Amino acid sequence: MASEIKKKLFWRAVVAEFLAMTLFVFISIGSALGFNYPLERNQTLVQDNVKVSLAFGLSIATLAQSVGHISGAHLNPAVTLGLLLSCQISILRAVMYIIAQCVGAIVATAILSGITSSLVDNSLGRNDLAHGVNSGQGLGIEIIGTLQLVLCVLATTDRRRRDLGGSAPLAIGLSVALGHLLAIDYTGCGINPARSFGSAVLTRNFSNHWIFWVGPFIGGALAVLIYDFILAPRSSDFTDRMKVWTSGQVEEYDLDADDINSRVEMKPK
């Protein structure tokens, strides 16, 4: 862990997470705000939901392609937690990424607050439960929405696979859009604790905010359980996991497997 913190590449990755998260939150939440919002007569709620969902999904796809080679483009604490539990990053990297993501979200939301300051009752995209939705229902929506996202991330970035084609960032972006199409009418769609945190901080309103941390973290952890232990099991033991968690990310390890159906041994180089 001490050796990783001394590397320039590590800090470049942290900065990349901060910058990409700032752009992501500005673009995505900005799409839900504006001087014609709430909806005008010539718009429908469905049209607006699709617009916002596409903005979230396409911005993730674009930024994942832009900084994925630098940081992995997590841009979501739930994704970071999932990759940590999947033994693909160190504990130090996970902590620094989540801090960078939260700070980036706050900065982006603060900029949006200044730009849209004349809007009446500006929520800055703050997540909350829709009318008639209770906390248990909202939590369930956040769990399912995040589970399918982290499952997509794990599957499309699995280096053991030989059948992958097309663009992983695009697939992940579509997964984000899909999550929003599901959840936006129930919770405003969090599935990203940092994005929810930025809006809560700037509006000083943390009502039901716990849902948008607990739900995504449970969903991310369940995705790892399903993928790494049921669908595509890995045979690394606790010692191997500790080496990744303390010494560095998965690029420093060999994953030996002939195909996706084989069990994998994680061996340090």
Curated annotation (Swiss-Prot):
Modified residue annotations for Phosphotyrosine: 253
Note the Pfam families from the entry.
Answer: MIP (PF00230)
Q: Which key words are in the record? A: Cell membrane, Glycoprotein, Membrane, Phosphoprotein, Repeat, Transmembrane, Transmembrane helix, Transport
Q: Which SUPFAM superfamilies match?
A: Aquaporin-like
Expression tissues: Detected in erythrocytes (at protein level). In the kidney, expressed on luminal and basal borders of proximal tubules and in the thin limb of Henle's loop (at protein level).
The reaction(s) annotated as catalysed by this protein in its Swiss-Prot or TrEMBL entry are: H2O(in) = H2O(out); nitric oxide(out) = nitric oxide(in); CO2(out) = CO2(in); glycerol(in) = glycerol(out)
Q: Name one GO cellular component term.
A: basolateral plasma membrane
Is the keyword Protease in the record? no
Instruction: Mention one GO molecular function.
Output: intracellularly cGMP-activated cation channel activity
Residue ranges annotated as motif NPA 1:
76-78
Annotated membrane topology:
Multi-pass membrane protein
Q: Which residues are glycosylated?
A: 205
According to the record, the parts of this chain that enter the bilayer without crossing it are found at 69-82, 187-199
State the phenotype upon gene disruption: Mutant mice are born at the expected Mendelian rate and appear healthy and normal, but display strongly reduced urine osmolality. Besides, their erythrocytes show reduced water permeability. Mice lacking both Aqp1 and Slc14a1 are born at the expected Mendelian ratio, but do not thrive; half of them die within ten days after birth and none are alive after two weeks. Urine osmolality is somewhat lower than that observed with mice lacking only Aqp1. Besides, erythrocyte water permeability is significantly lower than in mice lacking only Aqp1.
Give the record's GO biological process terms: ammonium transmembrane transport; camera-type eye morphogenesis; carbon dioxide transmembrane transport; carbon dioxide transport; cell migration; cell volume homeostasis; cellular homeostasis; cellular hyperosmotic response
Per the UniProt entry, the disulfide pairs are none
Where do the TM regions start and end? 12-29, 47-65, 91-109, 134-153, 164-181, 207-224
Q: Where in the cell is it found?
A: Cell membrane
Q: Which residues does this entry mark as bearing Phosphoserine?
A: 247, 262
The text the record gives for the protein's domains is: Aquaporins contain two tandem repeats each containing three membrane-spanning domains and a pore-forming loop with the signature motif Asn-Pro-Ala (NPA).
Entry similarity comment = Belongs to the MIP/aquaporin (TC 1.A.8) family.
Subunit details for this protein?
Answer: Homotetramer; each monomer provides an independent water pore. Component of the ankyrin-1 complex in the erythrocyte, composed of ANK1, RHCE, RHAG, SLC4A1, EPB42, GYPA, GYPB and AQP1. Interacts with EPHB2; involved in endolymph production in the inner ear. Identified in a complex with STOM. Interacts (via the N-terminal) with ANK1 (via ANK 1-5 repeats). Interacts (via the C-terminal) with EPB42.
Q: Give the protein's function.
A: Forms a water channel that facilitates the transport of water across cell membranes, playing a crucial role in water homeostasis in various tissues. Could also be permeable to small solutes including hydrogen peroxide, glycerol and gases such as amonnia (NH3), nitric oxide (NO) and carbon dioxide (CO2). Recruited to the ankyrin-1 complex, a multiprotein complex of the erythrocyte membrane, it could be part of a CO2 metabolon, linking facilitated diffusion of CO2 across the membrane, anion exchange of Cl(-)/HCO3(-) and interconversion of dissolved CO2 and carbonic acid in the cytosol.
Q: What is this protein called?
A: Aquaporin-1
Source organism = Mus musculus (Mouse)
Organism taxonomic ancestry = Eukaryota, Metazoa, Chordata, Craniata, Vertebrata
Which gene is the coding source of this polypeptide chain?
A: Aqp1
